[in-house]
């Protein structure tokens, strides 16, 4: 397994010290110094003034002035630094460091999907203080349904944390499909009845709060960048396989959405001319071969009619159980999906050359999709002359991880609003 650079990890941990990228991106160097100080302190959890000054290449006097202003405004606080073990016996005043004041503001992240909605609240330090998931009654919804569900979810999670809406600085919402982040519009979503919806404006008007919306795969990528394996990586790609296939890309420690903001739609890249029908209405998309509805469609050839449930999850579990029991037709369905996934991953490597690919999503419980021969096929399909094989890691999944990424997007926006 090591020769194929395949690792299984649970990458998002609430207890990780600090949050956010541990390296400064090119864009961050262009932001106001107070914001840069906040980013460095938040990333390290607790850090000495002198270390912040060195990382930002500013003078001690400038750092003292900046930290004093941020302390007076309630954004950071002084805290005792733990001495190195060799200095435990030293006398004198313990060294003083800086830490983020968690109560300076709260941010809410929400994932809306066709089966369930989830929410996470972060304090200003990026610590998770609450989470909640709710099942969805109807799969297809109107924009007003989405607004109503979002507001109800926010009210419910605030009750569980004893916070008021006035404590919240910003909200971010993720949905699958084509999302114009800059314009705040949902161009297409598989469970929304309308297209080209100004969802950000609808939510802001209803919530009376600053709102950001984004494609849910981007939010999963932000979760890795802020809380997971991406914190210490300059560039990487995240590929998710659930009800659809999504992708997020980080370059120079920043999430990239494409030149016009609608890129990284790996699931709708074409892998077969006039191929299988995708839920987007076109044929030959990668998603149409490896997403859950694609596997269910193929399952009709392997399962008896009585075994095919209206519940996608139950049908897939039955198909998987048969494959594990040695049924060759069931195994062939997963094997075929794995080959298409290998093709898609090879295209990611060829186009973007990421330092690593992080695979996530509920469908990864089916190891046939990422077993050794799948990763070997990915490397075989990649132009490898002089190229080190790209590592592939299998990461944790679950609705709360997506919502935590949304909360990171909201926290990033809240920081811009507060540190101006």
Can you annotate each of these PLM segments?
Residues 123, 181, 250:
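Short, acidic, Ser/Thr-enriched surface-loop or helix-capping motifs
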Residues 90-91, 99-102, 164-165, 228-232, ...:
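Solvent-exposed alpha-helices and their adjacent loops that cap or buttress functional pockets
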Residues 78-79, 211-215, 249:
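General beta-strand structural signal in soluble alpha/beta enzymes
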Residues 97, 107-111, 119, 168-172, ...:
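Short glycine-aspartate micro-motif
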Residues 175, 241-243, 292, 361-362:
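Short secondary-structure boundary segments
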Residues 128-161, 165-172, 177-235, 369-380:
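Glycine-rich phosphate-binding loop and adjoining helix at the ATP-binding site
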Residues 1-94, 99-131, 139-166, 286-420:
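ATP-binding/phosphotransfer module of carbohydrate and carboxylate kinases, centering on a glycine-rich
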Residues 232-290:
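Glycine-rich phosphate-binding loop of actin/hexokinase-like ATP-binding domains
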């Amino acid at each position: 397994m090591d020769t194929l650079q395949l690792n299984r990890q649970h990458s998002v941990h609430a207890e990780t010290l600090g949050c956010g990228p541990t390296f400064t991106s090119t864009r961050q160097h262009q932001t106001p110094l107070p914001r840069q100080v906040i980013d460095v302190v938040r990333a390290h959890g607790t850090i000495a003034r002198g270390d912040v000054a060195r990382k930002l290449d500013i003078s001690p006097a400038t750092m003292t002035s900046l930290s004093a202003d941020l302390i007076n405004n309630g954004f950071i606080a002084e805290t005792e630094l733990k001495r190195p073990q060799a200095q435990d016996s030293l006398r004198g005043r313990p060294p003083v460091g800086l830490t983020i004041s968690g109560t300076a503001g709260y941010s809410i992240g929400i994932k809306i999907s066709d089966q369930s909605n989830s929410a996470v609240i972060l304090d200003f330090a990026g610590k998770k203080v609450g989470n909640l998931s709710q099942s969805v009654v109807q799969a297809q919804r109107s924009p007003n349904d989405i607004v109503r569900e979002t507001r109800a979810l926010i009210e419910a999670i605030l009750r569980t944390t004893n916070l008021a809406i006035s404590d919240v600085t910003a909200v971010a919402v993720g949905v699958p499909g084509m999302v114009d982040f800059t314009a705040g519009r949902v161009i297409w979503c598989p469970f929304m009845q309308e297209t080209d919806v100004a969802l950000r404006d609808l939510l802001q008007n209803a919530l009376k709060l600053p709102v950001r919306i984004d494609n849910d795969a981007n939010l999963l990528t932000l979760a890795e960048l802020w809380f997971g394996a991406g914190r210490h990586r300059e560039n990487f790609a995240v590929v998710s396989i659930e009800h659809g296939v999504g992708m997020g890309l980080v370059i120079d420690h920043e999430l990239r959405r494409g030149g016009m903001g609608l890129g990284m739609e790996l699931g709708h890249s074409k892998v077969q001319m006039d191929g299988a029908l995708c839920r987007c209405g076109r044929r030959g998309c990668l998603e149409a071969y490896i997403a859950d509805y694609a596997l269910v469609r193929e399952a009709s050839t392997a399962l008896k009619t009585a075994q095919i449930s209206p519940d996608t999850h139950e049908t897939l579990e039955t198909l998987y159980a048969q494959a594990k029991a040695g049924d060759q037709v069931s195994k062939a369905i997963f094997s075929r999906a794995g080959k298409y996934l290998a093709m898609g991953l090879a295209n990611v490597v060829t186009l973007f050359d990421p330092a690593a690919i992080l695979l996530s999503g509920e469908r990864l419980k089916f190891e046939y999709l990422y077993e050794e021969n799948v990763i070997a096929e990915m490397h075989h399909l990649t132009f490898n002359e002089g190229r080190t094989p790209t590592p592939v890691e299998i990461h944790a999944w679950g609705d709360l991880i997506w919502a935590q990424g949304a909360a990171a997007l909201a926290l990033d926006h809240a920081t811009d609003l507060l540190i101006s």
